[in-house]
């Protein structure tokens, strides 16, 4: 009888040692995209670069439905340092120029969804015409979530919204050209930093002009920037992405929310 139990125990041990339990498959690594918005309207958009608040909300609902994380450029830097993409897809929301709809329409919706966003200011125009005012910029930039996180980040869209590369021939020499670049990068940064907590570290190229140009990248670096957002349309390539050539996808009046998913493989 003892021999029977001994044989049974040995058989169980051998079986359990040989049996291979299926381990759960690791979650697929997601993709990251940057979305580029401009003016948001309360009614129907009147030109290609506008988007209605109704369609912006549809975009946000699309993010929720497909579990798309909304992150910041600083989050992107942390992901690159880690060398590993997070599970699930992510998007960085950006808004160009400085329309006052950012304060009246965009800010409340972002707060409702608890989303982060980066706003690129055309500095010369702030407080003029239909552009946002500095008081509103300050109110948005100082708003915090739990833990002191500032979800609304302000970057530079240059001082004068000039072509940074296409008009290069009008300068007499490289020194004059570099002085122009330093003003567009440096003066806009200085003025914005008078109204926000922290530093201005993200720049969006006006018209997408000059992406990858070494003089423009050098000007960004010496003026304290860590990121340049371009208008090249693709997903971000981690870990090989050059942060001075970050692609972005324009979201226009006629963009369908589900078209965003095409860049994420949805």
Question: Across the structure, where does each feature detected by a protein language model lie?
Answer:
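Short phosphate-binding/catalytic loops that engage adenosine nucleotides
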Residues: 68, 115, 225
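Metal-dependent polysaccharide deacetylase catalytic core of the NodB/CE4 family, i.e.
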Residues: 30, 35-43, 89-91, 99-101, ...
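N-terminal pre-catalytic segment of deacetylase/amide-hydrolase enzymes
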Residues: 18-90, 244-252, 261-262, 266
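His/Asp/Glu-enriched short active-site or ligand-binding loop at hydrolase and phosphoryl-transfer sites
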Residues: 121-122, 195-202, 209-257
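Positively charged n-region of N-terminal signal peptides that target proteins for export
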Residues: 1-4
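Bacterial N-terminal signal peptides
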Residues: 7-14
């Amino acid at each position: 009888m003892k021999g029977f139990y001994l044989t049974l125990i040995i058989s169980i041990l051998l079986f359990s040692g040989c049996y291979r339990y299926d381990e759960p498959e690791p979650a697929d690594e997601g993709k990251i995209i940057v979305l580029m918005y401009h003016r948001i309207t309360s009614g129907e958009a009147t030109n290609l670069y506008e988007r209605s608040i109704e369609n912006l909300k549809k975009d946000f609902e699309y993010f929720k439905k497909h579990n798309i994380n909304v992150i910041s450029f600083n989050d992107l830097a942390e992901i690159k340092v880690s060398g590993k993409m997070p599970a699930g897809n992510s998007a960085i929301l950006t808004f160009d120029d400085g329309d006052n709809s950012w304060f009246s329409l965009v800010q409340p919706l972002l707060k409702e969804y608890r989303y982060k966003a980066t706003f690129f200011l055309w500095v010369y125009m702030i407080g003029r015409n239909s552009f946002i005012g500095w008081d509103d910029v300050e109110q948005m930039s100082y708003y915090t979530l739990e833990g002191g996180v500032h979800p609304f980040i302000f970057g530079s869209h240059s001082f004068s919204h000039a072509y940074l590369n296409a008009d290069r021939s009008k300068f007499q020499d490289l020194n004059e050209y570099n002085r122009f670049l330093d003003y567009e990068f440096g003066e806009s940064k200085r003025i914005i930093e008078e109204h926000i907590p922290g530093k201005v570290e993200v720049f969006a190229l006006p018209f997408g002009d000059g992406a990858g140009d070494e003089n423009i990248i050098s000007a960004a670096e010496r003026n304290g920037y860590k990121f340049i957002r371009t208008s090249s349309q693709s997903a971000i390539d981690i870990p090989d992405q050059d942060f001075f050539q970050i692609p972005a996808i324009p979201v226009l009046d006629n963009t369908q929310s589900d078209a965003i998913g095409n860049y994420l493989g949805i």
